[in-house]
Amino acid sequence: MIKTRLSTFFAYLIKNLNNKLYYSLSELTTGLISLLLGFFISTGLSTIPGQTGDWGIIAASLIVAATELTSKIVYSSHKQLNIKINLFNNFKIGITYGLFVDAFKLGS
């Protein structure tokens, strides 16, 4: 095959597209695992303090403080965020979603 500008452009485009897809799928899977781990941890956070009865307010205040601090860090900056901050944000979203699901289960 003759090496033209068009063929080198397409080769470069395919190579970069492969790299982008690989890294984006890697971030997607780790983000999904982090989200599901947060959902799993929320079940423990909602049941363990309920057994003793006196840790409910303290646990709720710690969860709210961590949620607000994470939201402040993630949503205040407009630059590209670190992957660890995104994973922690997904973990926070999983915990919040899990607590809402537990509240709906108790309400029904």
Curated annotation (Swiss-Prot):
It is found in: Plastid, Chloroplast. Pfam families: DUF565. Keywords: Chloroplast, Plastid. One of its GO terms (cellular component) is chloroplast. Transmembrane segments: none annotated. Belongs to the ycf20 family. This is Uncharacterized protein ycf20. It comes from Pyropia yezoensis (Susabi-nori). The lineage of its organism: Eukaryota, Rhodophyta, Bangiophyceae, Bangiales, Bangiaceae.
